[in-house]
Amino acid sequence: MKRLILATAVAGMFMTGAAFAADSYEIDPTHAWVGFKTNHAGWTKAHGAFKAVSGTISFDKADVTKSTVEIALEAASVDTNDEKRNTHLKSPDFLNAEEFPQITFKSTSIEKTGDKTAKVTGDLTLLGTSKPVVLDVTWNAESALPWDANTIKTGFSATGSFSGADFGIAKMADFGIGPDIALDIDVEAIKK
């Protein structure tokens, strides 16, 4: 009986350790940059960014495939360096920020591609439509803040792309932009 209790306790410790192998992080909104660019009538690439970014990361360093990420962007925070254009992008012609205030990405699978790289597949939800998007992600570094040893920060960079038409942004072609939108993401996240 004592052996059974001891075996159960040991098994419980291992199962608990496995369950808590991933560390939890919260994206630091003051150190998060989500940029995008798209063709502008063949002249150049038009650039923009979302200024309000939040999210969480569950990062399992021992088995990155068990990690998860969720990111939310406030559609009304779009910034393209021109207020008139920003207002138009927030309208029903493009992001329809009033009806769909958030753009989200939730990971569904992760494939390790190198020591610090992975392909993260997730559901991008934009204008009420969810479609899979693949991001190429690099884990940059993790360390304590130089002025606060109790605060651990980790950082990631990611790139990817999607077609605006797939999400119902039908007016892109009317304004000579797109069809693809390239993403450039850098986030720092604080360990909870």
Residue spans for each PLM region:
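N-terminal signal peptide c-region/cleavage motif recognized by signal peptidases
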Residues: 16-18
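Low-complexity, acidic/polar, glycine-enriched regions of mature
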Residues: 20-192
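Bacterial N-terminal signal peptides that target proteins for export
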Residues: 1-6
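Repetitive helical segments and hydrophobic/amphipathic motifs
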Residues: 11-12
